[in-house]
Amino acid sequence: MQKIMHISVLLSPVLWGLIFGVSSNSIQIGGLFPRGADQEYSAFRVGMVQFSTSEFRLTPHIDNLEVANSFAVTNAFCSQFSRGVYAIFGFYDKKSVNTITSFCGTLHVSFITPSFPTDGTHPFVIQMRPDLKGALLSLIEYYQWDKFAYLYDSDRGLSTLQAVLDSAAEKKWQVTAINVGNINNDKKDETYRSLFQDLELKKERRVILDCERDKVNDIVDQVITIGKHVKGYHYIIANLGFTDGDLLKIQFGGANVSGFQIVDYDDSLVSKFIERWSTLEEKEYPGAHTATIKYTSALTYDAVQVMTEAFRNLRKQRIEISRRGNAGDCLANPAVPWGQGVEIERALKQVQVEGLSGNIKFDQNGKRINYTINIMELKTNGPRKIGYWSEVDKMVVTLTELPSGNDTSGLENKTVVVTTILESPYVMMKKNHEMLEGNERYEGYCVDLAAEIAKHCGFKYKLTIVGDGKYGARDADTKIWNGMVGELVYGKADIAIAPLTITLVREEVIDFSKPFMSLGISIMIKKPQKSKPGVFSFLDPLAYEIWMCIVFAYIGVSVVLFLVSRFSPYEWHTEEFEDGRETQSSESTNEFGIFNSLWFSLGAFMQQGCDISPRSLSGRIVGGVWWFFTLIIISSYTANLAAFLTVERMVSPIESAEDLSKQTEIAYGTLDSGSTKEFFRRSKIAVFDKMWTYMRSAEPSVFVRTTAEGVARVRKSKGKYAYLLESTMNEYIEQRKPCDTMKVGGNLDSKGYGIATPKGSSLGNAVNLAVLKLNEQGLLDKLKNKWWYDKGECGSGGGDSKEKTSALSLSNVAGVFYILVGGLGLAMLVALIEFCYKSRAEAKRMKVAKNAQNINPSSSQNSQNFATYKEGYNVYGIESVKI
């Protein structure tokens, strides 16, 4: 095989020259392959032929070497760089990884590799192999391992081991880490035998093999040879090629074997490739002509596709890339990086395609993201996919294991008894239930859920209502369970599908599925009456302090305007008038007296203005800043005014559990038997403990027998009773007529409803998988929307509030009319006072003039008196009066 590789390497320039010819569109690609990588090299060549187009050709320059030899890697890398390659594909190990990454970062040459992912950031290194750490940790947690041995190959790096040890320290796992990377081939049989004997003494029956295919095959051979470490043992093969190893030897031995697979043979893209791959000639393409492909070979094929796509994108962007005149010595001092290497690195990282290894996408560090790894188990009929792991969904189990033997026949022939409880909207009696029989009498969320579970698990069922109407709690004296939990514990029912909360004490006696609904304890109170805006609610958009500041600002601005107008010489002016034929000048006047200043400021604030304006610069500055001030204030006021006038707010007496615990006026309680009461009884949090102390000693009792009783108590208490219940039920009742309850504050805890089965029931696993599948399909959310909101009776606003919040009533703006009427009345009163005052003054003046006329009745005096009278009379005439 190695001879074939050597011949292909020596003849590669000739072969590729014949295939592609000499073309200006030829792109030189370097290749560093370890000796013995026959299949990887064949996949590389197939990719070159497959993805080359008429636009350009990828021309490879291949070097076959020992990747563990840093000197050989340095020579090969420098040789590739001096040939003017645009990018290099190749492999590395722990001894050569630093050399390659250093050259790439210094010379700006991109290196695409399917080797193990490195920690940290390495510029110009594109890693095709996804990181396995997250999937491995998820699988360990899925199997609930807390003690296991970890056999690792040092050539693959220690990052995965470090992640396992970090999780072990956090979750208190017992991990025995053993390095099998440096085992001498001559003594490997003896070494492995001694190793497994030590594991047997330590009772380590769970083993993780963090090794590549050849090392895994060696270990499996020794396990079979020894014969003691097969049945009852569980092995996890921690690489991405579960089907690459020779598992036939251990398939029927009784051991549990799990692992990971990056190449999904059920995928249509992989199937088409395998059809072509299996037809290739073994002599021309060593390692081909098989029905499978190693995951490293698949990553090699994908790497060629990534490079091709990157150069195609550069062509589309009309970015010219050339190595002419840039091929130099990589050992030059100082090193001269390739100027256009950054463009190629950017193009490679931006590639997103579908390949043999699934979705191929990279982050800014050149590492794979958004990938999916299949979870595999070895069955008697061969490797089988049981689920998958992704960065978003984490581990998802998709294989449903049906009960075997008599359990299957029993499940198919038996009618499963499903216990539940009458609780809206989970289980309700239909209006015409007297005319119906069996399961048709019921409707609700859990009724629909039971039908879906039965359909997925393949059994017939009968719905029964729990006799005592309780969920399930253990009596403190007799230790007997009641409710639905009791029916499961004492064999009266096979499964409970109801709003049954998953708790620790219940989990000790029954099994729960994954939660089908998440919720928490919440507070229900009677909805307070909506407070209508007050008569003077138009003042609410601004706080009381702001209104006071505005008043002081108004007075201050008026005074400042008055003062600057008095001090500024440019504010004084002389009025001229004609007296016969001559023009006369009166004395200097100033329009901005204190009253005119107040009037000017008021007009500006009301956005109206007045008939006078400042003449001086100082006065205009005062006016300008006042206008700016009023612009912002009025705009802010107007923006908030609509909300304050149209929205009828509900003022809740409490907003949280803290508010409840700090007062005694409003009583509060829970269901007398259930998880909510148990939560407060066991809680060590000060607030909840204080609430429990109150509820336990309150008279009359604040506990209720049913949720319906608790809701009725809330509605009849006129706001003096709060009921603590699950948030889902609270939200449902809030949507039911008479729409007089509401949920306040956030949830007090976080928990979930689960489907319960007796301990060890054959239904448990099937039901759990059915719940997961329904959740993935979005059916659980659809059911909740159907029974909570689609059938709601109060609307989104709760009742008939929509029209009330869209139109203003007279009460909203009554204060404005009051001010208008008050202003008009005040104006008339002031006018009357002015008239009376002026009339009295004129009467006195006329009386004085008349007396003077009687004493000295001269014509001049009469004329003067008449002029005086005329002047006073014209106050109410056309002539203006200056203040």
From Swiss-Prot:
Gene3D superfamilies (alphabetical): 1.10.287.70, 3.40.50.2300, Periplasmic binding protein-like II
Subcellular location: Cell membrane; Postsynaptic cell membrane; Postsynaptic density membrane
Residue(s) carrying Phosphoserine: S683, S717, S860, S863, S880
Tissue: Detected in brain cortex, hippocampus and cerebellum (at protein level). Detected in hippocampus.
Positions of glycan attachment: N256, N370, N406, N413
Transmembrane segments: 544-564, 617-637, 813-833
Family: Belongs to the glutamate-gated ion channel (TC 1.A.10.1) family. GRIA2 subfamily.
Other information: The postsynaptic actions of L-glutamate are mediated by a variety of receptors that are named according to their selective agonists. This receptor binds AMPA (quisqualate) > L-glutamate > kainate.
Domain remark in the UniProt entry: The M4 transmembrane segment mediates tetramerization and is required for cell surface expression.
Subunit structure: Homotetramer or heterotetramer of pore-forming glutamate receptor subunits. Tetramers may be formed by the dimerization of dimers. May interact with MPP4. Forms a ternary complex with GRIP1 and CSPG4. Interacts with ATAD1 in an ATP-dependent manner. ATAD1-catalyzed ATP hydrolysis disrupts binding to ATAD1 and to GRIP1 and leads to AMPAR complex disassembly. Interacts with GRIP1 and GRIP2. Interacts with NSF via its C-terminus. Isoform 1, but not isoform 3, interacts with PICK1. Interacts with CACNG2. Interacts with GRIA1 and SYNDIG1.
Protein name: Glutamate receptor 2
Gene coding for it: Gria2
